[in-house]
Amino acid sequence: MSQAAARLMERILQPVPEPFALLYRPESSGPGLLNVLIGEMSQPQVLADIDLPAPSIGAPRLDVLTLIPYCQIAERGFAAVDDQSPLLAMNITEQQTISIEQMLALLPNVPIQLNNERFDLSDASYAEIVSQVIANEIGSGEGANFVIKRTFLAEISEYQPASALSFFRHLLEREKGVYWTFIIHTGSRTFVGASPERHISVKDGLAVMNPISGTYRYPPAGPSLTEVMDFLADRKEADELYMVVDEELKMMARICEDGGHVLGPYLKEMTHLAHTEYFIEGRTRRDVREILHETLFAPTVTGSPLESACRVIERYEPQGRAYYSGMAALIGSDGKGGRSLDSAILIRTADIDNCGQVRISVGSTIVRHSEPLTEAAESRAKAAGLIAALKNQAASRFGDHLQVRAALASRNAYVSDFWLMNSQQRQQTQSDFSGRQVLIVDAEDTFTSMIAKQLRALGLVVTVRSFSDEYSFDGYDLVIMGPGPGNPSDVQLPKIDHLHVAIRSLLNQQRPFLAVCLSHQVLSLCLGLELQRKAIPNQGVQKQIDLFGNAERVGFYNTFAARSSSDRLDIDGIGTVEISRDSETGEVHALRGPAFASMQFHAESLLTQEGPRIIADLLRHALIHTPVDSSVSAAGR
């Protein structure tokens, strides 16, 4: 250990230390090395206000460590309880690296006595909230999945900074499979955690996100291969992961020139449980503060669609989240004149005040077929590594077992090749699309960003506008009316009313357009089709359907569905409309008519196997079947 590192550690081990951080980031700093940081704290109002020194040429350095509370998502205009948790930034003034062996030799190991241990919500109370979310939110079409938190509370007897450092030591010694193991002391509070999940990292212009979902809780005797295989075969667990991959693909589509490239899945094994995970990579030139802003916050700890999830969280968590589901982000200079970024989601994290009051918030992903009491048990398991004395038991590992690897690989057999390809492989420019202008109208679901990436790969020139923006249909060869949450019949809502008016305008002008999911439902109503709420929502469901004579595997995210008893309808003022539908239930999968097409499913989703081809075929139909004398002069809304 260098003398400089020893001096920093001596200051950190003082009875009243200055702000500091000890970070074990094996994927970034290298295995066996910890960052030792001391700095000065500030409270910027917004992420753009984080003060960064100019990038330098030479040795890489770390500049700022920021702690981003959940309520910071209000920056994006999304709903959030304002619990007065500030955005915190540590401007790093001194930094060193030391080995894990040297760190363990220095850290204290004092006994930790927890008093008054309890959850703020009992298992029964939490299960009741899960039931309400399934019935009232997922069941009403507000979204596909939501994460609702509960919080473990306790007091550390005779608390001192050495208690938190001992807690950090225990995690460092025993936790495995984590992305960051850390202690961050701000002066007024201390965060100690073992987060399994990267939020986003950027190095040499390559951005990486790491969606993790699905949970296997180890039994008291430890994991077994049979149970691991059962976990990997569980459709609910797979669906949870596919849904968060879709949501993070939306984010990557916003910040990366060519969108995200999906790698995996893999088994992530930890001390008390295991998860499944993917990685998503993409090239970006955006400022790191802008990247953090655009990725507030991970769907794995909020839900999807994100904007709708924020409204649900605000309704069911009136006390706010503080820093739970926020992030710790480390911004630096890469030594080549550019920025580096590494960040971890603030989960599996204890928030300790200077009196020793401990808060550990955890959550469970609620989907349409969640079992409420099972979700309560899962939330307890997620907290187990921090709550208990962290039993020093060796756990078996199965991530490299041939059967496990084969089971993981099989999850990609029927998903979209497009998102598994790199950007060069995706280019599928079609001569009849090259250079054509497309307007996408976003209805509060950034699946539209993924649609845009697929359209650009086909050679189209894409513009995305929110339904609430001023826009015109003039100058575009095609219009895509996008998906979003909500009841398509509720025209009292401004968004729904807007979609009805816009789609009727497109029909009247006979402009070529494609309607997706919510907009497909609005189109169905405009055409006089019956619309019903589904008894069991399709939220993150892959089905094989007959799409106008072709068997296709497609992904559905819908609570409402149009129905028809016929495969064709002749509609006055419109013409003949072809209907792709379920022959048993009559549920409508897609429509084709003069100058338009629509789909209830999401061709852009990871769950749709041949998404770009399906979109291309439907757009081609809309263009080819546009009447020669169609009006193109009237403006859209």
Swiss-Prot record:
Classification via InterPro entries: ADC_synthase, Anth_synth_I-like, Chorismate_C, Class_I_gatase-like, GATASE, TrpG/PapA_dom
Residue ranges of every copy of the Glutamine amidotransferase type-1 domain listed in the record: 437-628
GO molecular function (one): transferase activity
One record GO biological process: L-tryptophan biosynthetic process
One Pfam family, short name: Chorismate_bind
EC number(s) recorded for this UniProt protein: 4.1.3.27
Catalytic reaction equation(s): chorismate + L-glutamine = anthranilate + pyruvate + L-glutamate + H(+)
Protein name (database record): Anthranilate synthase, phenazine specific
Source species of the chain: Pseudomonas fluorescens
Top-level taxonomy: Bacteria, Pseudomonadati, Pseudomonadota, Gammaproteobacteria, Pseudomonadales
Encoding gene per record: phzE
